[in-house]
A protein has these predicted regions:
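Short amphipathic alpha-helical elements of helix-turn-helix/winged-helix folds
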Residues: 57-65, 76, 101
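Short acidic, hydrophobic short linear motifs in intrinsically disordered regions
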Residues: 67-89
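Residue-level detection of the helix-turn-helix DNA-binding "recognition helix"
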Residues: 78, 103, 143, 147
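A short, conserved structural fragment
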Residues: 106-123
């Protein structure tokens, strides 16, 4: 069985984005057409379906590296921030975009929060989380997409036919 680990991201992510759009798992918010995706970007994304592509990339990262949190995802999707004459520094991606996408994926039942422990807060007990991991339904969707693009992958990358 082909899994998400066997397919390169350049083939897998567009196919997963299309499957998620058909599945109605995520939808682009109204404000998403006006925002940048990271502090190191100068303009909003040019693609009309960039929200689905980002959500697919987030789901792939959770499937491969989960449990993973919003901060680690923001660092992974960030880039190189141009500081002019000073040296470039790492720029992180928008946590609001990542958090909203994760909330939509949670509502669709594709990811879930991983509770770690309960600590005592000012207002009572507070649940702490280690990030999000993929659910069985999310794993089924991801593996189904990986299996559907297997032939295309084998034609582009001949060495992958052993998987």
């Amino acid at each position: 069985m082909t899994t998400v680990f066997d397919i390169p991201a350049d083939i897998f992510n567009p196919a997963l984005a299309k499957a998620m759009a058909d599945h109605d798992a995520v939808s682009m918010p109204d404000w998403a057409g006006y925002v940048k995706t990271a502090v190191d970007r100068e303009r909003p994304p040019a693609q009309a379906d960039w929200w689905y592509a980002r959500s697919a990339a987030i789901l792939r990262k959770i499937a491969r590296n989960g449990p993973i949190g919003v901060t680690h995802l923001a660092q992974a999707f960030g880039g190189k921030k141009d500081n002019g004459a000073m040296p470039n520094t790492p720029g992180v991606a928008s946590r609001h975009i990542i958090r909203t996408s994760l909330q939509q994926l949670e509502e669709a039942g594709l990811v879930e929060k991983v509770p770690t422990k309960v600590v005592e807060g000012e207002d009572g007990p507070v649940q702490l989380y280690a990030g999000r991991r993929i659910t069985a339904a999310g794993q089924k969707l991801v593996n189904g997409v990986a299996h559907s693009v297997r032939e295309e992958t084998e034609s582009m990358y001949p060495g992958l036919d052993k998987y």
